[in-house]
Every structure is written in structure tokens, then in C-alpha cells.
Amino acid sequence: MRHQKSGRKFSRTSAHREAMFKNMAASLFKHELIKTTLPKAKELRRVAEPLITLAKVDSVANRRLAFARLRDNEAVGNLFTILGPRYANRPGGYLRLLKCGFRAGDNAPMAYVELVDRPVVAEAVAE
């Protein structure tokens, strides 16, 4: 019986799943917006939100914990220099999921995962 075993398997081994979410979290912290399937986006919240909470207190120990989970220096740098101070006064809920239709090949539900309060880049509007 699998009572109280939380988390989805995604038809992957545990190592593959762990690597996938490390890479997705690192991409999210670098780009602040990623597009993925809706189930993966929902599961990514369980990985990314605790890391942002960890980044609120900038210490060598916390940086090492974050690096152990992400294995990406650039992502850890962004996490502690940009995202930690940005969310210092927010008690959680750092990510927003926006549904964006279905993938053409297999009709999988897709979603954008973005960081809340991210700066909006003004795009040039053709007149």
C-alpha cells in the first residue's frame, strides 16, 4: 500500500526525477519564467519554494545547502542576491502557475511557472 507517500513519479526513476527538478528549479531561478507541463509545474513548487525561503537568510551555510540541492553556481547566486532580498517580507507563495493551453504533439496541459513580483520587461511596441 502506498498510504501517505506524497509526490508524483512521472514514470521516471528517483534519480531522474531528482535531476529533472534540480534543473527546472535552476532554470526558474535564472530566468524567472519557465514553461512546462502542468503536473511538473505543480510538483516544482515543492522544490523551489523551500529554496527561496532558505535564501531569505544569506549565510555561507545556507548557500551550501542551496548548492547541494541545485548544483548550479549561477542559480544559487541569483537566489541569494536577487530573490532572497526580494521576498524577505513575503511569508510564502513565491510562485505563480499560469495555464497556457495544451501541447501540440500529445495534448498535455501546459503551464508557465513564474516568480511573483518579478520585474516586467517593457517590450517595444510597433506603432
From Swiss-Prot:
Q: What keywords appear on the UniProt entry?
A: Ribonucleoprotein, Ribosomal protein
Q: Name one GO molecular function term.
A: structural constituent of ribosome
GO BP annotations, alphabetical order: translation
Gene Ontology cellular component terms for the protein in this record? cytosolic large ribosomal subunit
Q: Which InterPro entries match?
A: Ribosomal_bL17, Ribosomal_bL17_CS, Ribosomal_bL17_sf
Assembly description: Part of the 50S ribosomal subunit. Contacts protein L32.
Which family, according to the similarity comment? Belongs to the bacterial ribosomal protein bL17 family.
Q: What is this protein called?
A: Large ribosomal subunit protein bL17
Q: List the source organism.
A: Stenotrophomonas maltophilia (strain R551-3)
| Gene label | rplQ
